[in-house]
Amino acid sequence: FILFGIFILTEKKVAQPLLDLGIFKSKLFSMSIIMALFNFTVAMFSSILLPFYLQDFRNYGPGLAGMIMMAYPVAMLIASPLAGSAADKMDKEIVTFVGISGIVLSQLGYLLINPHSAPWLVVVILLIQGMSMGIFQSPNNALIMETVDRKYLGIAGSVNSLARNMAFVLGTSLATLILFTAMSNPVSYTH
C-alpha cells in the first residue's frame, strides 16, 4: 500500500506519467474497472473452493468433480457471444447490470449448498455464475474502452488487464486463506 501511494504521488508530479491518472475521472470507467475487479475476485473463490468441496467434503472422484466444474466455462462460452451481440444492440450498462445481478444471485445460491445438496444444485449455481460472467464481461470491456479518449485506449486496456490479474491474485489469496483457516480449525492449528 505504501509503494502504491508513492506511485500515485509520483505519477501526479511527473510531466509524462507512466499511467495518466486522468482516465479515472470518468465515473463509468472507474466503476467498470471496480466491477471487473469484484467479478474476477468472486470467480476465483468458486474456482479454488469448489474442487475441495466436491472432492474432499462430498467424496466425489476427480472425474465427477471436473464434470460438475465444467458447467461454469460451458455456460460462459455460450453466454459471452450472445451478450456481446446484445450489448451492440442495446445499452451496455443494462447488459452489464444483468451480468452483475446474476453473479450476485449465484453467490447467494452458494448459501443453499449443504452436506446433503444434490450435485445438480452445484451445477445450476455454476451455470448461473458462468452465464452471468459471460454476460458481464464483453459489455464491461466495451464500456471501459468507450469511456476514454482514443489516445488512452492502450492505457485503458492495460488497467483492465491489471484489474483482472489483481482480482485473480486477490481471489486466490482470500479463498486459500479461508480454505486453510477452515481446514485448520478442526485440528486446532489456529490460535
Tell where the protein language model's regions lie, with residue ranges.
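C-terminal membrane-cytosol helix-exit motif in multi-pass small-molecule transporters
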Residues: 2-12
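12-transmembrane solute porter fold
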Residues: 16-185
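Conserved small/polar residues in nucleotide/adenosyl-binding loops
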Residues: 190-191
